[in-house]
Structure formats: C-alpha cells, structure tokens
C-alpha cells in the first residue's frame, strides 16, 4: 500500500531531466504495491524551492506533465540534489491532485513529505494546527506531518534555538500515532533528507563511486529526555539536547565514524543515496542496502548519512549497528520480458520457482530434508503443545492447505488463523505454543502486529516469507525463506505454490525422527521430486483454459468452487484469484458443507467448478458432485488423469496425479490460469486489480 522513493546525488552531476526520470522510474518499479495517484518533487529554477509534479492515475502520466511544466529547466545540471516521490493508495481523501504526495507545509515548501501508513490521531492534530493558523489544502492525514514540521521549526526560531532537521522530525514523530514511514525534504535545509521508519518498511540504498570499505553503520541512541512522552494537546514542547546534531559539511573520502554515526564522503567522491519502501526500486541502481529498524531516523545531508533512534538506550535495547547488506535479486527478475502481464509470467515461472524453494534443502537420494533457518529451533518446535499459523489472504490459504499434513506427521494440534481476526480476539497464547507467521512480503501489517502480540506472550515465533530483511524475517526467532523470487503481480501465484512447498518441507523436517511416519515421508519426497515436471504439464492447459474464458463464462456473475480435504483450500485460493482480478463473485466451499445451505444456490444458470482427485475422500466428493448434476448445475471439473474418463461429458481440465498432500499445487494452477484469462477477456489489467495493493502495510 503506497510506495516511497527518494534520491539524493552528492558530487554527482545530473541534469534535472535525469533526476526526474530516475524518480518516475523508481515509482514504476513499485507500481505493483497498488496506487491511484503519484507524484514527485524536484528543485525549481531558483534551486532553492521545489516544484511538485503530481497526477491522478498511472505513473507514466508524470512524464508528460514533467515535460510540459515551465517551473523547472530540465536541461540544467546540478552537482547536489535531493528529491522524493510517492505512489498513493487512498486511505484518507479521494484520489486527487491535492491529495497526492509529496504534501507541503506551506507555499514556500518549507517542508515536503511522502508517507506510507496511517496517522491515527490526525484529526486531533489538524484541529490543533488550525487553531495555530495553519490551513490545509488536502483531505489527507499526511499533510499534518508537513505542517507539524513547520510548526516545530517556528517554535525553535521563536525560542531562538538552533534549528535542526532531525530534531524537527523527531518531534513530528513523537506527536503522530499509528504505523508509518516518512521521508522529508525541505527548502529550509537544502540537500538534506530525513527518513523515519515506524512499523512501515523503508530501506536505504548506497551507491558510492568506488568500492565500499565498510559494512555497517553505528547507531546514535537518543537522550533520556527523548523518552518523556510529549503532546501538543496537554503538555509543553520539549526539545532534548540530543536532538541537535552537528554534521560535517565537508565532502571527503568515504570513511565510517561509529562515534558520530556518520558516513563521510571525502575528496568530493560522488555518492548517490536511494530511499525506498521496496528493494525492487533499488536493484537497477545498487545492491548495497540498509534495512531500517522501527524507530530509526536516517539523516542524509550533503553526502553524509547518519542513523539515529527515537529513544535512549535506557528505554529500548537493540543492535548498535545497521549492517550494509547485498541484495541478490537480478533486474531481469522484476521485468515482464516477452509476457503481456507479470501475472502470466509468474504463473509460468512456477515450474522453476518450486525448484528454487527446494534447492539445497532436500536430498532426493538420501530422502532427507534440512532447513537451515530452523535448525537451531527444531527441538523447540517439536516440543510445542500446539502449532498456530497466522496469515492473511493467499498466505492463509497456503497455511490451511498444509494443516492436515502437519497434524498427520507431527501429531500436534494445528490451527490456522486469519491475522486480523486473531488480533481482534487476542486469544490466549502460551509459552509452549509455536506460532508460524506466513507472509509473502514479510510486512503484512496484521501479521506483524500478531507477531508482536505472540512475542509478548513468550511463544516461539517462526517466519515464512519471500523477502529478505522484512519485518517478519527479522523479528521472528527463526524461519524459512521461500525463494520464489520477486512477485510483482498483485494477485499472488508463484508465492502460493512456494509457500505450499516450504510448509511441506517444514512438516518433513520436523517429523524426521518419527519412525512410524517414514514411509509416508518417503512417499511425499518422491512426489516432490516430480512436482516441477508435473507443473510444466499443467501449464500446457493454458490454451484450453483461455478458450473457456473467452466464451460465455466471462459474462458470469457468480461462481462456486467446491472441493474436499486437501482441495478445499485450493478452492478458496482459486475463488480469491477470480475475485481479485476478474471482479466476478466467487466462493470456495467445502463439499461436505454443500447440503448445509449452499446447495440452495444450484440451478442451471450457476457455473460450478469441482475439484476431484482420486484420494481417500473421492467417493464423498463424487456424492456431492452427483447432487450438483441432479439439480442441473453446470460443472467444470478439474480432475486427476486416473479418473478423467468419469467426466468426459463436461468441461474438464486434467492434471497429473501426485501424492494427496501435494495435489493442491497442481490443481490450483488451472484456477490461476482461468482467473488470468478471464480478466484479459473482460478487458482488465491482471497486474493492477482495482482497489487492491500488493503489500498491505496498514491495518
């Protein structure tokens, strides 16, 4: 939800047109997060103020606006410059130019801000600021942050105190409640950016002209005075001495000074710094990144970078350094290549992505599984009294799909929770519980909040994510990276099958000492050995699925998807895909529940997708299907090849047979293909479904 991008060049000559194109391209890389408007700022012809270039609609429209404006000479070259940009997903205020970021404090752009997240107390702040004479141009919560910054700046001047950008932003953050990330720029502080992370992801990219000679930054903790709560509404303002930082403005050779927590660029060596909410916006520029922690404040100033904390070390313990890490993602992985959409590209990548999930973790010769991320905690997980999965959306379905297998192999009670409902109930969590948090991004707000709740209860917390450096991957005790590669399409496809595989591997490793289960484990591992080639065979169904989607089905108003056992979660996931990108109402039902109400919907107009696989529950599944046939239902059948002859008279998609607990990996792919081809047939953009965001980072 929303995307942030920032760029600063120091002693690196760039034309303003180059800078503008870097900003727009950065936004294009994070389009998939979901948005309805976009914008960026760049210094105007005075080089002392900013021009804001904003648009409702697609990021590409910024190119035309940029080229038609007159306040910025795009041919002008600058040696030092900062700029911030944003894609907005409306939460407060409708999509409009006025509500698009960057948002400003005043007509002089004394402070500009881009923001991801929600300021929950913005109404109270707005009332206070209006009483102080501020007027608002937007309906957003974000504008309060910009005007608060100007308010604190004026307070410092009124008190004849030294004004300092970091001190100002610290006080803004102290008075804003909620989960958010900010990046501030200011006409009062040229060539400076201040970035804040508070429960919303931000990372910093570093691109020096030469090789980096260090691999971490020191962290400057605040003064004890920073720990005292302050409120504009009921107490005087307090500025601690620790909020004043004197930064070396000389640009010298690159060194690391842990005491000052500052990166110095000496001898006018060029340095480019990037700020982003997602690594996808950085990889074409640099592989060197810093993942920020909650309550980190980063000051980028004239070639210097320093990291500060909101509070003193007495109040919050934590690492005293931030490592510079290398991201391994290739640029080609986030490009569409020859495909029309990312979604169909990612569906077709599943043959390879499931192999990447298993690579180095399963030995098919010795039939052993080893998950390095769990090895130090395997014993603790095995000793758990119960296992709980907490997830949202597709990740919830992947967890549900593996519940029966985990119960079978581990002989431990397993429950699967929707993260938001879990938070609403705040159920009792014991120290003897093991809780898995499954999230493609590792930043899903409800899952992160649930993680912190479970940590506070003393449970052993495990992360299953697709994003290195994400909040869940950092804050859990251990975990598994699914290695699916970047997933750009909003509707998750390859992440689902990789999560599915990863959870199967978890079940296999945790049960490796159970002698009674060894035959079953071998059967599953033999199935995993062939799963990639079987996926390839299923992908060959794309043409026949497309033919069905291009027919009358695209005009259907509603669909039911029915399955039993391992196929029930598959139906739920397929229904979600159809809802997400075709806007057709779809519902996944358990076949055993059909006669308890849903059968009342069946008539000769309702299209029903049945998943039938030759497993222990097939006879019961077949009985449910007969009830549908008897009432004139119009079935589409996804079945395994050994029973395909039973459904020759219906529209049928035949998939290879595998072990029952893996069958859902193969039966979900026709549903992914169907949702994609239906969306295209209806004229919708499968990559950017309306009202949806890829990474839901607000509650």
UniProtKB/Swiss-Prot annotation:
Q: Which InterPro entries match?
A: GATase_2_dom (IPR017932), GFAT (IPR005855), GFAT_N (IPR047084), GlmS/AgaS_SIS (IPR035466), GlmS/FrlB_SIS (IPR035490), Ntn_hydrolases_N (IPR029055), SIS_dom (IPR001347), SIS_dom_sf (IPR046348)
* GO biological process, any: fructose 6-phosphate metabolic process
User: Can you state which reaction this protein catalyses?
Assistant: D-fructose 6-phosphate + L-glutamine = D-glucosamine 6-phosphate + L-glutamate
User: Where is the Glutamine amidotransferase type-2 domain positioned along the sequence?
Assistant: 2-303
**Its EC number(s):** 2.6.1.16
Signal sequence span is none
Task: List the PROSITE patterns.
Answer: GATASE_TYPE_2, SIS
The SIS domain sits at 377-516, 544-689
The positions flagged as active site in the entry are 2
A GO MF term: carbohydrate derivative binding
Query: Sorted alphabetically, which NCBIfam families does this protein's record hold?
Result: glmS, PRK00331.1
Report the function annotation for this chain.
Involved in amino sugar synthesis (formation of chitin, supplies the amino sugars of asparagine-linked oligosaccharides of glycoproteins).
Q: Please give the name of this protein.
A: Glutamine--fructose-6-phosphate aminotransferase [isomerizing]
